């Protein structure tokens, strides 16, 4: 599936038209928000309608309303899916969410080209996702530095130990995401965070991604060394996403005593 998505993305890049930039782009520090979380673990809450493996996750999809609910519940950042064909996202969702909330916004897509980096800036993203399994390490490094030169931060995602090692042989990203889901098989296990987190330098922000749906999961990935987590599907499947965030942290509604 990953290879198919990347082939589609290469086709899309060939015809990419850059949008007009936002009149005033106010950068919101992404890594800093995760280093100073509002709770025991930083939360990047994801706005996500569908996925290739699960189909439609949230039929009543209002990205702005969802993002505002996440912000009210104390999310440290918002992730917005912008891939259209496989995740039923849209780049206009990113711009709309950025204009509606006051926390940093991450663009979640399969970014493989410098034009997509420029596009992300124009859409108002504060950070972008770069997927280690989707890019040669030298290309990832080039896109990473291009992004930072334009004022974008990067969440560099890995799943396999070999991918992590290839990236760290070239440079040290500030934010490293450990995807608990194998993008080739879609098998998910929190053991990925347990395995990879000890290999990452303490200077990096470690984000555990995928497979987190309960307070026990939150405590587990924290014990493995994660400082933040990216959660989408388990929140999006619940009717009230604001209450879902509270429950994820083992709280009564609005009670952050934990």
Swiss-Prot record:
Catalytic activity: 1-(2-carboxyphenylamino)-1-deoxy-D-ribulose 5-phosphate + H(+) = (1S,2R)-1-C-(indol-3-yl)glycerol 3-phosphate + CO2 + H2O
Involved pathway(s): Amino-acid biosynthesis; L-tryptophan biosynthesis; L-tryptophan from chorismate: step 4/5
EC number: 4.1.1.48
Keyword Nucleus: no
GO biological process terms held by the UniProt record: L-tryptophan biosynthetic process
InterPro entries: Aldolase_TIM (IPR013785), Indole-3-glycerol_P_synth (IPR045186), Indole-3-glycerol_P_synth_dom (IPR013798), Indole-3-GlycerolPSynthase_CS (IPR001468), RibuloseP-bd_barrel (IPR011060)
Coiled coil: none
Keywords of the record: Amino-acid biosynthesis, Aromatic amino acid biosynthesis, Decarboxylase, Lyase, Tryptophan biosynthesis
Gene3D superfamilies: Aldolase class I
MF annotations from Gene Ontology: indole-3-glycerol-phosphate synthase activity; phosphoribosylanthranilate isomerase activity
UniProt-listed Pfam families: IGPS
Enzyme class, spelled out: lyase
PANTHER family referenced in this protein's UniProt entry, alphabetically: INDOLE-3-GLYCEROL-PHOSPHATE SYNTHASE, TRYPTOPHAN BIOSYNTHESIS PROTEIN
Family: Belongs to the TrpC family.
NCBIfam families for the chain: PRK00278.2-2, PRK00278.2-4
Name of the protein: Indole-3-glycerol phosphate synthase
Species annotation: Geobacillus kaustophilus (strain HTA426)
């Amino acid at each position: 599936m990953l290879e198919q998505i990347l082939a589609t993305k290469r086709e899309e890049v060939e015809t990419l038209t850059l949008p007009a930039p936002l009149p005033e782009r106010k950068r919101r520090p992404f890594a800093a928000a995760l280093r100073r979380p509002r709770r025991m673990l930083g939360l990047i809450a994801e706005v996500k309608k569908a996925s290739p493996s699960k189909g439609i996750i949230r039929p009543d999809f209002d990205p702005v309303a969802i993002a505002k609910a996440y912000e009210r519940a104390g999310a440290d950042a918002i992730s917005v899916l912008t891939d259209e064909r496989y995740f039923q996202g849209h780049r206009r969702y990113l711009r709309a969410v950025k204009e509606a909330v006051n926390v940093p916004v991450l663009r979640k897509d399969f970014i493989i080209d410098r034009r997509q980096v420029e596009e992300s800036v124009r859409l108002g993203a504060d950070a972008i996702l770069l997927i280690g399994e989707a890019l040669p390490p030298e290309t990832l490094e080039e896109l990473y530095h291009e992004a930072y030169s334009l004022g974008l931060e990067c969440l560099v995602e890995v799943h396999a130990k070999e991918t992590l090692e290839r990236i760290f042989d070239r440079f040290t990203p500030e934010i490293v995401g450990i995807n608990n889901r194998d993008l080739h098989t879609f098998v998910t296990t929190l053991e990925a965070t347990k395995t990879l987190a000890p290999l990452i330098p303490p200077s990096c922000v470690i984000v555990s991604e995928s497979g987190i749906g309960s307070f026990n999961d939150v405590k587990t990935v924290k014990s493995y060394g994660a400082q933040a987590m990216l959660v989408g599907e388990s929140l999006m499947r619940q009717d009230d996403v604001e209450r879902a965030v509270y429950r994820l942290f083992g709280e009564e509604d609005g009670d952050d005593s934990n």
